[in-house]
């Protein structure tokens, strides 16, 4: 079931309204950061990955399809993939 908050966020994202990012950050950043930190095990990389996650969310906002995934699932996948990419990049540079 889609919540009113999710409907509001999706509506703002589809319109290109930057308030959507603020609302997402307020409501989901802690959970996304937790996911990212579990993958990266490094606070600096995790913070960088979280920031990049929000950039990707904004750039891909109009591609989000609520019939394919709930909003949090979509955000989670972006965060997870960004964390994995950041970790690979870090390991390639310093590993």
Feature-to-residue mapping (PLM):
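Structural recognition of an alpha-helix C-terminal capping motif at a helix-to-coil junction
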Residues: 34, 48-55, 69-81
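N-terminal module of bacterial RNA polymerase sigma factors
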Residues: 1-31
């Amino acid at each position: 079931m889609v919540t009113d908050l999710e409907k509001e966020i999706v509506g703002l994202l589809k319109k290109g309204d930057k308030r959507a990012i603020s609302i997402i950050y307020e409501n989901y950043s802690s959970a996304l950061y937790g996911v990212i930190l579990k993958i990266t095990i490094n606070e600096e990389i995790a913070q960088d990955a979280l920031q990049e996650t929000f950039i990707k969310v904004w750039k891909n906002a109009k591609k989000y399809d609520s019939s394919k995934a709930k909003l949090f699932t979509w955000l989670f996948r972006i965060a997870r993939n960004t964390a994995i990419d950041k970790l690979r990049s870090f390991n390639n540079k310093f590993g």
